[in-house]
Regions:
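DNA-contacting interfaces and partner/effector-binding or oligomerization modules
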Residues: 50, 56-57, 61-81, 88-205
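Sequence-level preference for short, compositionally simple segments enriched
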Residues: 1-44, 51-55, 73-84, 125-128, ...
Length: 205
């Protein structure tokens, strides 16, 4: 198991008691690894895919607990050399799905709208945690430190940089083919867990 997967598994165990923080984390997860599903009569749904089973379970719990969805779940073997499993959750197109996307500040046409759930520092931490869980990687602190998050949305990448700057994290952004990469090489730790007894720190996040 890679160091990144170890960190993601640890983050996926963190319990968030505040719904606003759960929603902020879910929003970033969907923006990072989600896509729209179209239906008839202007109905919309969504699809979320990840290679981490703990992250998939976390998204499933959030969708069921906070928004009343019962997503279908699929597991398939990846096509790459290691053939890692890919876990996919699907919320079928419906009026409820469209209402959910509007509530989350996600516009099916524009792709990314201004985030309505980033008022407190805890919500911002949860948002960054979601972005990392959805599309981040990190090297071991003992080696040359490097944290990066990859997205296909320029606006989302810019928002990640802005949110990281709130915590005085000097993140930078670059583009690679069709992706935008937010990265940081200088070590800095920001607590992302609300649990006082168990507060794992991700260097740079």
């Amino acid at each position: 198991m890679s160091f990144t997967e170890q960190v993601k598994n640890e983050l996926a165990r963190i319990q968030r008691d505040d719904k606003a923080c759960r929603t902020a984390e879910l929003l970033a997860l969907l923006r990072m690894s989600g896509s729209f599903v179209t239906g008839s009569r202007g109905r919309w749904g969504l699809e979320f895919s990840t290679g981490n089973s703990a992250v998939a379970r976390r998204v499933l719990v959030y969708l069921k607990k906070d928004f009343g969805f019962m997503p279908s779940a699929m597991v398939r073997q990846g096509r790459r050399l290691r053939k890692k499993n890919v876990y996919t959750l699907v919320v079928q197109p419906s009026e409820m799905g469209l209402s959910f996307l509007n509530t989350m500040g996600l516009s099916p046409m524009a792709g990314v709208d201004d985030s309505p759930f980033l008022e407190s520092s805890e919500e911002k931490r949860a948002y960054l945690a979601g972005a990392f869980l959805g599309g981040g990687s990190v090297s071991r602190p003992q080696s040359d430190y490097h944290l990066e998050m990859v997205t296909q949305s320029l606006r989302f990448a810019e928002e990640i940089v802005k949110t990281m700057a709130f915590f005085h994290m000097n993140a930078r952004m670059t583009d690679r083919k069709n992706d935008y990469i937010v990265y940081q090489r200088r070590r800095r730790s920001v607590r992302i867990s609300p649990n006082r007894r168990r507060q794992p720190e991700l260097p740079g996040l």
